[in-house]
Amino acid sequence: TPHDFSLYKLGTLQRRIERRMAMAGIESGAGYLQVLREDSGERELLAKDLLINVTHFFRDTAAFDLLGEKIIPELVQRQTLDRPLRIWVPGCSTGEEAYSISMLFLEQIAAAKRNIKLQVFASDIDADCVAFARNGIYPESIEADVTPTRLARFFTKEDHSYQVVRELRE
């Protein structure tokens, strides 16, 4: 694959490889290596498994506090009204960080009473993750990471899940 996993921790690599071996029903490392040489599908599955998708809303509290208190207010104040404020979130995984950043920007734009159009672009090398993010449906467990005020403003409650409101998804 075109991905470089050389900086991953050995334990992480080993666990992910062992997981794929178990799923493929292969017991030996040599046997799995042979499968990887011959089966591009298995190579892609392993690469996808190695891509770490650890994410949740407002995951790094200190970083999001800094963004919300110092950086985003400054960007909002400096933004001219004749063009949109564009933000790119690379490596968005399933969207939680991208939506978290979007919420912070929309809150600051409202607090500053500025008529700024916000455009957030989120990308990831995993197309399935991007599709998940685009749908914006998350389990009830996000209540642990998202304040009730933000849940009410930025989400629609479904049966056992929350969906990000259209304003944020688009």
PLM features per residue range, with description:
Residues 1-85:
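A short N-terminal interaction module
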Residues 59, 93-94:
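Glycosyltransferase donor-binding loop in the core domain
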Residues 71, 105-109, 137:
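Active-site catalytic pocket residues across diverse enzymes, especially alpha/beta-hydrolases
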Residues 82-87, 98, 115:
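Active-site lining segments that contact anionic ligands and/or coordinate catalytic metals
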Residues 88-93, 101-102, 123:
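Generic beta-strand/beta-sheet core signal
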Residues 90, 111-170:
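Extended basic-aromatic, gly/pro-enriched interface segments that bind polyanionic ligands
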Residues 94-113:
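Conserved SAM-binding loop of SAM-dependent methyltransferases across substrates and taxa
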